[in-house]
């Protein structure tokens, strides 16, 4: 199947619900005020993309990857991030998650060294089998919760 390719695009105000996206590649794209709800992505790549004020809810992924993504002021609900890991020894799925609301997320089998979750609201999420340096301040908060 032929891949649909986007590079350097700004994608605004798109609402995609209960759809399957196959063979899309987004390089250096910005997503602003977009919504992806109950979507399935198959053989898709998001590389060096930024998401601002987006809702991503119950995303299902197969053979897809995110590389060096940034999320700011987003609602990220029901995402299994381990299923979106990029190939390559030094590739990073997430560059930054800032001022976001995360609920029912699963972070597993990921290298999150040097990653900072401060400034985000995280509820009912799982962190498993990670390589991660948790700052002492966050360790204290996690013990209280």
Task: Please give the residue ranges for each predicted region.
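Tandem repeat scaffolds
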Residues: 1-145
């Amino acid at each position: 199947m032929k891949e649909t390719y986007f590079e350097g695009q700004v994608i605004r105000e798109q609402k995609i619900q209960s759809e399957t996206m196959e063979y899309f590649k987004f390089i250096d794209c910005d997503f602003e005020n977009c919504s992806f709800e109950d979507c399935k992505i198959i053989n898709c790549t998001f590389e060096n993309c930024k998401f601002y004020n987006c809702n991503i809810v119950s995303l299902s992924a197969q053979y897809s990857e995110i590389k060096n993504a940034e999320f700011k002021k987003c609602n990220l609900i029901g995402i299994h991030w381990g299923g979106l890991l990029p190939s390559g020894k030094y590739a990073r799925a997430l560059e930054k998650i800032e001022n976001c609301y995360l609920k029912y997320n699963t972070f597993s089998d990921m290298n999150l060294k040097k990653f900072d979750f401060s400034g985000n609201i995280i509820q009912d999420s799982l962190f498993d089998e990670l390589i991660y340096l948790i700052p002492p301040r966050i360790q204290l908060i996690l013990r209280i919760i």
